[in-house]
């Protein structure tokens, strides 16, 4: 063992991993959340340019809307100031959606090369979008702060745990979850093929 699994000083808490229920589970549905971290960054306007520094003279007033993460870090809403990174991510998400639409059209038209091209492009955009979280969670990047990465993962943990709780409250058994995916027993009648 290298000790890499041990918590390092200053390291942020990652995504939520639900304990695995060992065994063979028939009829499992996988709920995977589209671009969870980028969506959180867009929806909560998470950016170095929107983080509200408690020591800074510009503080939100009573009537100012802010996004407050589960870690209690605060970010200006887009009404006050739209973040640079959320703006870039919105554009990238739109590009990825367009490539995915082109994949469907290429399949329909039986254009294999076009399908492969757009699949490669959407995958490259996906990696680029997810790299923004990696930058925010890194201590090496110049325009970051621990509040950024820790807020993103805290909102993700909160979201996934809330959804798991709602599923279980409705009688759907969750057998596993990891970061942005939930594996749940599908409500298929006993004895179904």
Predicted features along the sequence, with ranges:
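Conserved acidic
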Residues: 1-193
């Amino acid at each position: 063992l290298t000790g890499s699994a041990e918590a390092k000083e200053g390291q942020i808490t990652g995504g939520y991993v639900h304990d695995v229920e060992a065994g063979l589970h028939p009829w499992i549905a996988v709920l995977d959340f589209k671009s969870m971290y980028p969506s959180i960054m867009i929806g909560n306007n998470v950016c170095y340019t929107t983080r509200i520094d408690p020591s800074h003279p510009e503080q939100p007033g009573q009537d100012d809307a802010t996004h407050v993460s589960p870690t209690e870090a605060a970010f200006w809403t887009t009404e006050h100031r739209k973040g640079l990174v959320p703006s870039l991510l919105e554009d990238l998400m739109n590009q990825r959606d367009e490539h995915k639409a082109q994949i469907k059209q290429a399949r329909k038209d039986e254009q294999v090369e076009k399908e492969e091209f757009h699949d490669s492009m959407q995958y490259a955009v996906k990696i680029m979008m997810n790299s923004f979280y990696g930058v925010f969670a890194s201590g090496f990047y110049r325009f970051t702060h621990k509040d950024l990465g820790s807020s993103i993962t805290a909102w993700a943990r909160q979201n996934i745990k809330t959804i798991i709780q709602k599923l279980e409250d409705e009688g759907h058994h969750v057998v596993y979850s990891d970061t942005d995916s939930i594996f749940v027993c599908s409500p298929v009648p006993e004895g179904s093929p």
